[in-house]
């Protein structure tokens, strides 16, 4: 599933084609994805101007001129793709099979925005902009890891006394929004913390030290366009390339990259997810 860097990369890719532009025509090609689409969604989107595109955790919100926001979740395989007749500045050829094009937005200026989702685990909804944060998918989320509310004091307080593994704590969207399996593995490796270590056992310094590392990993991944392991593509159909710089994720059996370490990357399963770690570096 796309994590924060992938969703932020998609948002940035959509912005030139959508922000400030009118939705000249919307088409909805099926009744549902993961959940049913809102009633008359195509009719309600047509004629609306996109005021801005923003991201909350792993969700994209397009704020519209009529006072509603289009809430978008990519799910496991969803793609928001920019294409159009005017190839050039930000319009591209459509890189995915059209049979999975479930929602199409024809934008003022000639761009076409397509929500393509082969596995149909994605979702779209229309919500009142002023009440968007109260939407059931958003209301439970913790602070953004790249925002000012997420700092060392906050994280130390949330981890104190917790008897869950530190990896599970960082994946808990109520504690911090947008982190997923890939980036938590990478963060814990850089921090030298074993994924199975209890969150409450971390010293205050260790807890506070996670915050700059989380930001570091996320910003590096955004700069690289995210990680393409299976379905994820940027808005122009291109692959992300942060996967080429993984230090631990997916490297089971390979030597640890830490200079002077003789360890080999191992893999354990936690709550059904693979955790990659160096048993020598991470304690």
From Swiss-Prot:
Q: Which GO terms describe its molecular function?
A: 8-oxo-7,8-dihydroguanine DNA N-glycosylase activity; class I DNA-(apurinic or apyrimidinic site) endonuclease activity; damaged DNA binding; zinc ion binding
Substrates-to-products reaction catalysed: Hydrolysis of DNA containing ring-opened 7-methylguanine residues, releasing 2,6-diamino-4-hydroxy-5-(N-methyl)formamidopyrimidine; 2'-deoxyribonucleotide-(2'-deoxyribose 5'-phosphate)-2'-deoxyribonucleotide-DNA = a 3'-end 2'-deoxyribonucleotide-(2,3-dehydro-2,3-deoxyribose 5'-phosphate)-DNA + a 5'-end 5'-phospho-2'-deoxyribonucleoside-DNA + H(+)
Zn-finger (FPG-type) residues = 247-283
The record, for Pfam families, names: Fapy_DNA_glyco, H2TH
Q: Which GO terms describe its biological process?
A: base-excision repair
Q: Which CDD domains match?
A: EcFpg-like_N (cd08966)
Which NCBIfam families does its entry note? fpg, PRK01103.1
- Record function comment: Involved in base excision repair of DNA damaged by oxidation or by mutagenic agents. Acts as a DNA glycosylase that recognizes and removes damaged bases. Has a preference for oxidized purines, such as 7,8-dihydro-8-oxoguanine (8-oxoG). Has AP (apurinic/apyrimidinic) lyase activity and introduces nicks in the DNA strand. Cleaves the DNA backbone by beta-delta elimination to generate a single-strand break at the site of the removed base with both 3'- and 5'-phosphates.
Oligomeric and partner information: Monomer.
List, alphabetically, the HAMAP family matched. Fapy_DNA_glycosyl (MF_00103)
Entry protein name: Formamidopyrimidine-DNA glycosylase
Organism, by scientific name, is Cereibacter sphaeroides (strain KD131 / KCTC 12085) (Rhodobacter sphaeroides)
Gene symbol of the encoding locus: mutM
């Amino acid at each position: 599933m796309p994590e924060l860097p992938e969703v932020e990369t998609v948002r940035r890719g959509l912005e030139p084609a959508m922000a400030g532009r009118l939705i000249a025509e919307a088409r909805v090609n099926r009744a549902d994805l993961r959940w049913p689409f809102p009633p008359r969604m195509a009719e309600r989107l047509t004629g609306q101007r996109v005021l801005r595109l923003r991201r909350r955790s792993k969700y994209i919100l397009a704020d519209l001129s009529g006072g509603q926001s289009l809430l978008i979740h990519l799910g496991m395989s969803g793609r928001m793709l920019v294409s159009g007749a005017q190839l050039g500045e930000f319009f591209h050829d459509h890189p995915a099979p059209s049979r999975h094009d479930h929602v199409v937005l024809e934008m003022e200026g000639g761009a076409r925005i397509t929500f393509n989702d082969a596995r149909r685990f994605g979702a779209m909804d229309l919500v009142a902009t002023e009440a968007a944060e109260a939407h059931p998918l958003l209301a439970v989320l913790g602070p953004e890891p790249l925002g000012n509310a997420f700092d060392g004091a906050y994280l130390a307080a949330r981890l104190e006394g917790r008897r869950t593994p530190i990896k599970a704590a960082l994946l808990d969207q109520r504690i911090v929004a947008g982190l997923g399996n890939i980036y938590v593995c990478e963060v814990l490796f850089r921090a030298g913390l074993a994924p199975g270590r209890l969150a409450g056992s971390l010293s205050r310094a260790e807890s506070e030290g996670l915050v700059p590392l989380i930001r570091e990993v996320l910003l590096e991944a955004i700069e690289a366009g995210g990680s393409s392991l299976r379905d994820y593509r940027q808005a122009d159909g291109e692959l992300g390339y942060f996967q080429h710089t993984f230090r631990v994720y997916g490297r089971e059996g390979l030597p640890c990259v830490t200079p002077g370490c003789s360890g080999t990357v191992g893999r354990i399963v936690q709550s059904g997810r693979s955790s990659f770690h160096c048993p020598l570096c991470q304690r």
